[in-house]
From Swiss-Prot:
Its main location: other. GO terms for cellular component: pilus. Pfam families: Fimbrial. This is Fimbrin-like protein FimI. Residues 1-19 form the signal peptide. It comes from Salmonella typhimurium (strain LT2 / SGSC1412 / ATCC 700720). NCBIfam families: PRK15200.1. InterPro entries: Adhesion_dom_fimbrial, Adhesion_dom_fimbrial_sf, Adhesion_dom_sf, Bact_Fimbrial_Adh_Pro. Belongs to the fimbrial protein family. GO terms for biological process: cell adhesion involved in single-species biofilm formation. SUPFAM superfamilies: Bacterial adhesins. Gene3D superfamilies: Fimbrial-type adhesion domain (2.60.40.1090).
Amino acid sequence: MIRKGAALAGLVLMSPVIAQPVMVESGRVHLRGQLVNGGCAVATESQNLRVLMGQYRTNAFTGPGSFAPVSVPFSLRLISCSAEVWRHVGIAFAGVTPAEDPHVFLASGEGIGNAGIGLALFDDQQRQIIPNTLPLHYTPILTSEMTLHFTARYRAISENMTPGRIHSEVWFTLVYP
């Protein structure tokens, strides 16, 4: 009986050595990235920028195409710029546009979708930036840090505007000509 117990204990202790892991191919992981040779990097504080647009009365708009009375300034800071890599940089803005006016970004209301208003962006010369297009103007890279200035302004896209909180999601990309 003792021999059986010793043999059984030996088998239990040896089983991890004898056991082989079973491997079954279950899938693959595809990892992709991109190496770029950009002339500038976006400063951390400009990567997820929030611009507070303020509060406006619906009667501040005189009809479709009319702008809010106030332009709200914002800036994007670029760092580690090198004119040895690229001589100019531009900013392209992308996002959803309303069917009523593809020259502005969609301003969505809480749970209502289109609020009857769009968001227009302008460069530092107050030229309107058309959404989802390449920049029309580029800035020379003269220093290692640059700040590009813009303004945002609401524009009526419908006779019917829905009061409430509104927001717009806009993405930007550095473009080198």
